[in-house]
């Protein structure tokens, strides 16, 4: 960044903002980069401002029982705030003085008052000087207030962030992500530009008092008629505002329904294409859009009437003020024109400035109170440690995550009793709700010496993670004591990657030691992964390390924990995402060897780990089930240990399944020991539905950090179901639009209307910060740990408000170590962290965009022509009247003037009455122009219709775009087009265009009238208009680029907050809060640099506009004074209209800039509409299907299938030289893949994580850029359409897709099948019992990714879709990744039965599933290494041979059948596993 010219600028340069000229010149000539932006002044740095406010807030906290944040702000900013307020008041006072001078000028032209004619020129100079003074006062004052507002926002931003890092975990569990983002976005944004309006709350009453005093002198009591009318207009506008809010509230729900489906479609676009659901999704979204647009139109009409009210009130306020006085006493023109000028100022003050000021104070004080409450919340308390302690001791430790649960339990129980469930089962309730008031940990005791390994195991939700949190001090014990040195290192269960290099993530601010670093890299098996990157360990990782696989992220997190030199290492299930071989190697080399002399506590469920641990602690339901050595476990609990070791290959199971088995075993033995509750009662599954369909689930922050901790405390009830606290009065649409640009995009979306109160929702809590920290969003498809293939899409849900697509950090802050923080920003590194495409659209909206927008809807052209015709007609009529009255005979001046002055006439008569009538007509014409009912409503209506067409075209384009194009985009960027940009097209653009057209036509009309009255003025008008157009074009190039850079700079602030929250436990464990506060301040300073420069250039432009007009007004004043003879009416009309033109023309120019800015949304939409389509025309003609385009049967005109017209008939696949890429210009992910599959054969895909197994399945569906050929039953994929090709496959994807809709819609979106057929399939896959327990059965509405269903049930839904599709080839991509044994057996059985004659291609990590395959395709380094039977693979040295255990190997040879039978009997022992485990095993 460059040093700012402001530092060396002179007073004159600062006053006129001339120091911004270099950036304006550069922005006009070329595209601005971040390197062109000026550094911020030191007074605006986040460090200084936050320190200043923090000091005052601490003083406030120390001195008072009820501290007030506004007092701290007052002490920091009050005097500057008042100084600029006084300048603003003086500038506004000049507006009240100007009409007095205007009146004197008009009076000097009275034929009977020739004495004053000589001073008219001096009065004109005085009037012009007032304009100059006003310009010099108002602009610095407005800029100064904007600047103070910016400083207040920065200081409070920093204060909130620092407080967030200090909050206790209990508090974080009660705060939603939406609330935090709301504090930092909607609430604080009110200070930036709103502060300039705040002073009008006292300026307007003083101004109105002054104006009414001056009007009283002119019109006496009748002046109050005009004021009364303006007050009525203000109340009328307030009523319209309330009506508009009512429509917006209704519409907000409809918009959110549409955005839910749209976001689900975007996030799961690969599944939508795989299922061929493009038409169904398009129809579903368009239907919702239609309903939404009905309410949009109503709201737009109300807003139109509100906008028109301001325009037409101008004429009536003058009319009502003047008419009573004129009828009673008569009136002269001087009073009329003076009154008109006063009323213009009065109208703006009463109907605009004062309501805006009141709203600003209301919003600002509300925001300050919210921030004040937040800043007083309970903080995290650091435990007192003894640094000389070498042992870790816990004595009788008991802890609760949440307090006051007893009352909540009673209330929820009462609610349940009062609510009747439709199936009549009133006992359906939380089966584990009795645990609600129980501690998460109870009477825990253990002691480990230095260098020992304690293995912690236990059932799901037993409190394993909570135990580590209590040791770290995150969870405060309510009883007992903990003793250790306090030098802790921590590895979270869900890996957290901060933006930066791999090296920075591992070192994490600790001093760099080359030998230690290399040892850790080697022990964590990262050497091979790092060697694959061109920049090795200096590669910059973006958003959450999304370009890495889950295993790579897990190993980097582990390496970070191991690299730190600590006394105690807390490892929370660090191996969950590693394959069996890698896990074994890391455990041996890292945990057992490298850390041999360190004290370690490892959360694990592996028998191998338990055997090697010095001590074992097994937890169950928060209590100690066993503590001792492994040999003691075998002696004291022989039944338990033998049960676990009785499972074949227990350690080979996935971590989820091991936890499931462990949970079931512990519960079985604890129940047998206690004999308390019957097992069947415990496994009852249930749910309940809220009374109000719109009630939504609580989305608190602690959940986001730790939904995966799966506490035995259960889902909250309807008391806390919203994204904001239950008692929040914030409007619905406001809370639903505040979302971070992160992977946890669900806060943008409305929550479900269904609350599951049974075990199926165990572990799925609100979207809280605690959930965020453990990386579980709770919504399938939005989890953090994505596989390598999926991660390349870089898709995460983004905000709909104020978010552009930029990754968290504006730069890599340290090149070598996280210890040092550079002061200079490296722009190259900044570009690397830009995760989304920077908008590649021109700085100024092109004429082509305007032309496309106008022609998108034919009626729009006719409406614009109609507007022009009406305007020309109005101007023509006004000119005719003007010419007629110009030629009308004049009356005798003497008697009439005397009579007028003596007020003997009760009517409006003067010698220049013709001019007065002309002005009355001009006022009426302007009013008609402003009211514009004949053109305004059709214009607004047509522009909304254009928005409808654009949305339809964009939706169709996105659904038909190839994945290679979508892979280059970010889901947040796509969703922003459908949310933010469509909202602009619906709401802002129509009214802004209407205002712009209104203002331009008013200015043109006024200029024509003035020019006709005084032709010389037209000569002055032409250069002024040219100057305006040139100045606008000059400024627009730079301002739009600065605004874009400012928008891009805003996203890192919010993303940094979310990133910090995800890793909050890690930050605290490593003591890196100051480092991350510095990073946050850097992100704030980057945004401030852009915003401050934008504010400065905007003020430069506004000031130049006013200066040009002041010159124009000086010219008009002297032309009219010097060229007008005896005609006070002509001078009055010219000067009054000229003064009116000034404000209107400035407004019009600003509106034109707003239109250009909003049209960028249209440009972005057109960019999406112009995306390529993926449809590939078949090389051979295709005969249409007999049953229509949605038929389950494809009839292909092909020589291979003429005898049997049903295709595919057998499922034979031949793959020849298949090469696949994610994007056309990218590297090949798969190269020259060739093999063939016989009909009905089962083929397993083998290979390491990231080898391309999932990619191959995507290539079969033509979801990637592919070369080569695939044939199914002799039909080449080039000879048929994409839809026909994809319908040949049944798909069970790794990422389960359940969209918001009924069960029926989810199973059969095209409505091809009747209920009988759907129920038959539901029976086959074991879904009937699940569906029947919901009210409405097939018509029950699933929302929020089907969160009421377990992951296993969702997989069964996918299976049912495949059965209904009648596909002959089934593709399964790790279908059992998160399944419990019961659901897994159902899926295996169904596949065997329903797809007995089908070809099955399976990508799976479970050994027992792979054993059923006849052949295996081994993929290594993007190529096929082997394609053989499993027996042949085992006879050779291969990766598969190393991974498979001896017991599994036995199943493949002569005794295979009996072995299989034995295996089944063991799995059958789990038949009593409850649905709770099914839910708990999912991520």
Curated annotation (Swiss-Prot):
Binding site for ATP 2: 1222, 1247-1254
Subcellular location: Apical cell membrane; Early endosome membrane; Cell membrane; Recycling endosome membrane
Residues with PTM Phosphoserine: 549, 660, 670, 686, 700, 712, 737, 768, 791, 796, 814, 1447, 1459
Cited SMART domains: AAA
Catalytic activity: ATP + H2O + closed Cl(-) channel = ADP + phosphate + open Cl(-) channel; chloride(in) = chloride(out); hydrogencarbonate(in) = hydrogencarbonate(out); ATP + H2O = ADP + phosphate + H(+)
Ranges where the record places region Disordered R region: 654-832
Region (Disordered): 1455-1483
Domain ABC transporter per the UniProt entry, residue ranges: 423-646, 1213-1446
Cytoplasmic topological intervals: 1-77, 147-195, 244-298, 359-859, 942-992, 1037-1097, 1154-1483
Top-rank lineage group of the source organism: Eukaryota
Record carries keyword DNA-binding: no
InterPro entries noted in UniProt: AAA+_ATPase, ABC1_TM_dom, ABC1_TM_sf, ABC_transporter-like_ATP-bd, ABC_transporter-like_CS, ABC_transporter_C-like, CFTR/ABCC7, CFTR1_ATP-bd_dom1
Segments passing through the bilayer: 78-98, 123-146, 196-216, 223-243, 299-319, 340-358, 860-880, 921-941, 993-1013, 1016-1036, 1098-1118, 1133-1153
Database matches in SUPFAM superfamilies: ABC transporter transmembrane region, P-loop containing nucleoside triphosphate hydrolases
Lipid-conjugated positions (S-palmitoyl cysteine): 524, 1398
Entry-annotated residues carrying Phosphothreonine: 717
Domain ABC transmembrane type-1: start-end pairs: 81-365, 860-1157
Keyword tRNA processing in annotation: no
Modifications after synthesis and translation: N-glycosylated. Phosphorylated; cAMP treatment promotes phosphorylation and activates the channel. Dephosphorylation decreases the ATPase activity (in vitro). Phosphorylation at PKA sites activates the channel. Phosphorylation at PKC sites enhances the response to phosphorylation by PKA. Phosphorylated by AMPK; this inhibits channel activity.
Any Gene Ontology CC annotation: membrane
Domain comment, as recorded: Binds and hydrolyzes ATP via the two cytoplasmic ABC transporter nucleotide-binding domains. The two ATP-binding domains interact with each other, forming a head-to-tail dimer. Normal ATPase activity requires interaction between the two domains. The first ABC transporter nucleotide-binding domain has no ATPase activity by itself. The PDZ-binding motif mediates interactions with GOPC and with the SLC4A7, NHERF1/EBP50 complex.
Protein name: Cystic fibrosis transmembrane conductance regulator
Species the sequence originates in: Atelerix albiventris
Gene: CFTR
């Amino acid at each position: 960044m460059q040093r700012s010219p402001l530092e060396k600028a002179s007073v004159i340069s600062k006053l006129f903002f001339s120091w911004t000229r270099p950036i304006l010149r550069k922005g006009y000539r070329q595209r601005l980069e971040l390197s062109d932006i000026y550094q911020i002044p030191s007074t605006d740095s986040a460090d200084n401002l936050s320190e200043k406010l923090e000091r005052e807030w601490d003083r406030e906290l120390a001195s008072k029982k009820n501290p007030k944040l506004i007092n701290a702000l007052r002490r920091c900013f009050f005097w500057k705030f008042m100084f600029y307020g006084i300048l603003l008041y003086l500038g506004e006072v000049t507006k009240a003085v100007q009409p007095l001078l205007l009146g004197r000028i008009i009076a000097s032209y009275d034929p009977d008052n020739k004495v004053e004619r000589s001073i008219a020129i001096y009065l004109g100079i005085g009037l012009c000087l007032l304009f100059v003074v006003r310009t010099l006062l108002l602009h610095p004052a407005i800029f100064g207030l904007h600047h103070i507002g910016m400083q207040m926002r920065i200081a409070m931003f920093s204060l909130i962030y620092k407080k967030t890092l200090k909050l206790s975990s209990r508090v974080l569990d009660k705060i939603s992500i939406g609330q935090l983002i709301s504090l930092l976005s909607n609430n604080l944004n009110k200070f930036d530009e709103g502060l300039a309006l705040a002073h009008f709350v006292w300026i307007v009453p003083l101004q109105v008092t002054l104006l009414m005093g001056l009007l009283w002198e002119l019109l006496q009591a009748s002046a109050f008629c005009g004021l009364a009318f303006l007050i009525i207009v203000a109340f009328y506008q307030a009523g319209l505002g309330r009506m508009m809010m009512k429509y917006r509230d209704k519409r907000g729900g409809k918009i959110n329904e549409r955005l839910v489906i749209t976001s689900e479609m975007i996030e799961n676009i690969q599944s939508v294409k795989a299922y061929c659901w493009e038409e169904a999704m398009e129809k579903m979204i368009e239907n919702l859009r239609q309903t939404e647009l009905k309410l949009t139109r109503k709201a737009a009409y109300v807003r139109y009437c509100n906008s028109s009210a301001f325009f037409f009130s101008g004429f009536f306020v003058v009319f009502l003020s003047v008419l009573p006085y004129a009828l009673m006493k008569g009136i002269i023109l001087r009073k009329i024109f003076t009154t008109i000028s006063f009323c213009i100022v009065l109208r703006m003050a009463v109907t605009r400035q004062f309501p805006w000021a009141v709203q600003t104070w209301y919003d600002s004080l509300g925001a300050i109170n919210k921030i004040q409450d937040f800043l007083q919340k309970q903080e995290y308390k650091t435990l007192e440690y003894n640094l000389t302690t070498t042992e870790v001791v816990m004595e009788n430790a008991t802890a609760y995550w949440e307090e006051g649960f007893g009352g909540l339990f009673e209330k929820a129980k009462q609610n349940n009793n009062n609510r009747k469930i439709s199936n009549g089962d009133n006992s359906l309730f939380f089966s584990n709700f009795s645990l609600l008031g129980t501690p998460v940990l109870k009477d825990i005791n253990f002691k480990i010496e230095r260098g020992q390994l304690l293995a912690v195991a236990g059932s799901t939700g037993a409190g394993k993670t909570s135990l580590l949190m209590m040791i770290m001090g995150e969870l405060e014990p309510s009883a007992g004591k903990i003793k250790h040195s306090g030098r802790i290192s921590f590895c979270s269960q869900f890996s957290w990657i901060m933006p930066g290099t791999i090296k920075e993530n591992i070192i994490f601010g600790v001093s760099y030691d080359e030998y230690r670093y290399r040892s850790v890299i080697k022990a964590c098996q990262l050497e091979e992964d790092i060697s694959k990157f061109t920049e090795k360990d200096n590669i910059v990782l973006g958003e959450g390390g999304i370009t890495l696989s889950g295993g790579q992220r897990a190993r980097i997190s582990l390496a970070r924990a191991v690299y730190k030199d600590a006394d105690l290492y807390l490892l929370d299930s660090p191996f969950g995402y590693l394959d069996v071989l890698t896990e074994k190697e890391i455990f041996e080399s890292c945990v057992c060897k490298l850390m041999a002399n360190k004290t370690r506590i490892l959360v694990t469920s592996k028998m191998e780990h338990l055997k090697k641990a010095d001590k074992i602690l097994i937890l169950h339901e928060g209590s100690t089930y066993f503590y001792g050595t492994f040999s003691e476990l075998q002696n004291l609990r022989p039944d338990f240990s033998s049960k676990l070791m009785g499972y074949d290959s227990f350690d080979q199971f996935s971590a989820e399944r091991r936890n499931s088995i462990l949970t079931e075993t512990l519960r079985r033995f604890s129940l047998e020991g206690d004999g308390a509750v019957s097992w069947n009662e415990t496994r009852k599954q249930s749910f309940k539905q809220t009374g109000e369909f719109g009630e939504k689930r609580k989305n608190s922050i602690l959940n986001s950090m730790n939904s995966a901790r799966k506490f035995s405390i259960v889902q909250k009830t309807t008391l806390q179901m919203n994204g904001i606290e239950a008692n929040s009065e914030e409007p619905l649409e406001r809370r639903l639009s505040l979302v971070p640009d992160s992977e946890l995009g669900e806060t943008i979306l409305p929550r479900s209307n269904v609350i599951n109160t049974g075990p199926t929702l165990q572990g799925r809590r609100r979207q809280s910060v605690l959930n965020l920290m453990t990386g579980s969003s709770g919504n399938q498809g939005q989890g953090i740990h994505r596989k390598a293939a999926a991660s390349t899409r870089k898709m995460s849900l983004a905000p709909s408000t104020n978010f552009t697509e930029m990754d968290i950090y504006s730069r890599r802050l340290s090149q070598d170590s996280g210890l040092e923080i550079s002061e200079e920003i490296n722009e190259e590194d900044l570009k690397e962290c830009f995760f989304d495409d920077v908008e590649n659209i021109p700085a100024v909206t092109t004429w082509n965009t305007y032309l496309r927008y106008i022609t998108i809807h034919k009626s729009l052209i006719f409406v614009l022509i109609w507007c022009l015709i009406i305007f020309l007609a109005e101007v023509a009529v006004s000119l005719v009247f003007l010419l007629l009255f110009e030629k009308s005979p004049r009356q005798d001046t003497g008697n009439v003037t005397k009579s007028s002055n003596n007020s003997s006439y009760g009517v409006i008569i003067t010698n220049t009455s013709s001019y007065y009538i002309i002005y009355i007509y001009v006022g009426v014409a302007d009013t008609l122009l402003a009211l514009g009912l004949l053109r305004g409503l059709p214009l607004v209506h047509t522009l909304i219709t254009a928005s409808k067409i654009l949305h339809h075209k964009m939706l169709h384009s996105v659904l038909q775009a190839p994945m290679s194009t979508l892979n280059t985009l970010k889901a947040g960027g796509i969703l922003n087009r459908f949310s933010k940009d469509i909202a602009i097209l619906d709401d802002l653009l129509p009214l802004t265009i209407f205002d712009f057209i209104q203002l331009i036509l008013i200015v043109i009309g006024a200029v024509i009238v003035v020019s006709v009255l005084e032709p010389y003025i037209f000569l002055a008008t032409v250069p002024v208009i040219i100057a305006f157009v040139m100045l606008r074009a000059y400024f627009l190039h730079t301002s739009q680029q600065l605004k874009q850079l400012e928008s891009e700079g805003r996203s890192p602030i919010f993303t940094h907050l979310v990133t910090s929250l995800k890793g909050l436990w890690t930050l605290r464990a490593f003591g890196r809060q100051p480092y991350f506060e510095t990073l946050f301040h850097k992100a704030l300073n980057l945004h401030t640099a852009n915003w401050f420069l934008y504010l400065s250039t905007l003020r430069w432009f506004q000031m130049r506009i006013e200066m040009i007009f002041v010159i124009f007004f000086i010219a008009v004043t002297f032309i009219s004074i010097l060229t007008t003879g005896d005609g006070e009416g002509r001078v009055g009309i010219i000067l009054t209209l000229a003064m009116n033109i000034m404000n209107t023309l400035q407004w019009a120019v600003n509106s034109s800039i707003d239109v250009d800015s909003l049209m960028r949304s249209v440009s972005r939409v057109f960019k999406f509409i112009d995306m390529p389509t993926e449809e590939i025309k078949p090389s051979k003609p295709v005969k249409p299907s007999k049953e229509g385009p949605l038929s389950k049967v494809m009839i292909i005109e092909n020589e291979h299938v003429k005898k049997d017209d049903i295709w595919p008939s057998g499922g034979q696949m031949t793959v020849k030289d298949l090469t696949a890429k994610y994007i056309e210009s990218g590297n090949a992910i798969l190269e020259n893949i060739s093999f063939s599959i016989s009909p009905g054969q089962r083929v397993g895909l083998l290979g390491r994580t990231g080898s391309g197994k999932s990619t191959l399945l995507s290539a079969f569906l033509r979801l990637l850029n592919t070369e080569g050929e695939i044939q199914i039953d002799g039909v080449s994929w080039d000879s048929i359409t994409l839809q026909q090709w994809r319908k040949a496959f049944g798909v069970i994807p790794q990422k389960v897709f359940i969209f918001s809709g009924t069960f029926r819609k989810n199973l059969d979106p095209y409505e091809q099948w009747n209920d009988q057929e759907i129920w038959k399939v539901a029976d086959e896959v074991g879904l009937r019992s699940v569906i029947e327990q919901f009210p409405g059965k097939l018509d029950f509405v699933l929302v929020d990714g089907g969160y009421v269903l377990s992951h296993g049930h969702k997989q069964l839904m996918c299976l049912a879709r495949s059965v209904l599709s009648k596909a002959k080839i089934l593709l399964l991509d790790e279908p059992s990744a998160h399944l419990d044994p019961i659901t897994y057996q159902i899926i295996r059985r169904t596949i065997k039965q329903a797809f007995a004659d089908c070809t099955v291609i399976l990508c799976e990590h479970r050994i027992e599933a792979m054993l059923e395959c006849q052949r295996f395709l081994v993929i290594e380094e993007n190529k096929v290494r082997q394609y053989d039977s499993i027996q042949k693979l085992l006879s050779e040295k291969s990766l598969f041979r190393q991974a498979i255990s001896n017991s599994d190997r036995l199943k493949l040879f002569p005794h295979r059948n009996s072995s299989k039978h034995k295996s089944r009997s063991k799995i059958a022992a789990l038949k009593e596993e409850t649905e709770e485990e099914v839910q708990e095993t999912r991520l």
